[in-house]
Regions:
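FMN-binding flavodoxin-like domain, especially the glycine-rich phosphate-binding loop
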Residues: 2-5, 13-18, 24-35, 43-53, ...
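Local sequence-structure signature of Cys/Sec-based thiol-disulfide redox active-site neighborhoods
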Residues: 4-8, 183
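A generic structural signal for alpha-helix starts
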Residues: 10-13, 87, 188, 216
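Membrane/wall-proximal cationic-aromatic binding patches
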Residues: 38
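A mid-sequence, solvent-exposed acidic-amphipathic segment
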Residues: 160-198
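Iron-sulfur cluster-binding cysteine motifs and their immediate structural context
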Residues: 182-183, 188-216, 220-237
Length: 260
């Protein structure tokens, strides 16, 4: 096992890009993706263990809490958490800290990828995608330096009861939205969406993608579709699609990414 481990959930690449930037600064790091159940959960030999994830519906992405409860971290390991968000960081860091106590935590604003809910420009303060990327890169390097010096956050992540309530109803909202997926005639049945889906919720049938109801709204399928053939209501056709420019669709399907 590498000296450093970062567990990462990423739907459209922003969090994986941040995890990779942090890993390059730390060196000798295994990034373990959490889109599905992690390939490795016993990381007691790692000296530093981090977690990078987005805010989904005010909390953790679907399935992440269950995975966190299976992870074994060494008693002397330095632990850190990073949440990326658009408008607000939510209660995800609070939930993570209640499961795996964090020595250090922070939150970073980046592009909103839930375009059926909000436009990308919802970031606070509003910035262009290029500006948001530069800001995230700079912040990732700062985080890595804090981790290398074993910085300690002065207080625990805030509880944010309103966001906890939001997170509790989010699965019902997601279930409703899953019924509104549509695939246009632009689909060329390339299969990229099916390979990306962490729930195996997409299949190629009759020369086009068919999307089922077991969706957690990572939106990898929509944002990485090379033909922009996938939508969730008309509003997603009107809004610009986005995925992180530094992360390929293939990387999101990996289980572990090692960075020297």
């Amino acid at each position: 096992m590498s000296e450093n481990v970062i567990f990462c959930y990423s739907g459209t690449g922003n969090c994986l890009d941040m995890a990779k930037t942090i890993a390059r600064e730390l060196g000798d790091t295994d990034i373990i993706l959490m889109r599905k159940e992690p390939a490795v959960t016993d990381v007691r030999d790692a000296k530093r263990v981090g977690f990078v994830f987005p805010c989904y519906g005010g909390g953790l992405p679907g399935g992440v809490e269950e995975s966190l409860r299976k992870i074994q971290v060494g008693l002397t390991a330095y632990t850190f958490g990073v949440c990326q968000y658009a408008g607000y960081m939510g209660s995800g860091l609070y939930k993570l800290n209640s499961i795996i106590p964090l020595r250090y935590w922070t939150a970073v604003s980046h592009q909103c990828t839930c375009i059926w809910l909000l436009p990308h420009s919802v970031m606070l303060p509003p910035v262009t995608p290029a500006m948001a990327q530069r800001r995230a890169d700079k912040k990732a390097k700062q985080i890595a330096q804090d981790v290398l010096t074993r910085a300690v956050s002065p207080k625990a992540p805030p509880k944010k009861p309103v966001n906890q309530l939001e997170s509790s109803v989010w699965p019902k909202i997601v279930a409703g939205k899953a019924q509104k997926f549509a695939v246009s005639d632009a689909c060329v049945a390339c299969g990229q969406c099916a390979r990306l889906c962490p729930r195996g919720n997409i299949r190629i049938e009759g020369g086009r993608a068919v999307i089922g109801g077991n969706c957690i709204q990572c939106l990898s399928c929509l944002q990485y579709c090379p033909q922009q053939a996938i939508s969730i209501g008309r509003i997603t056709d009107r809004r610009e699609h986005y995925h992180n420019p530094n992360v390929t669709a293939a990387e999101l399907t990996e289980s572990i990414i090692h960075i020297d």
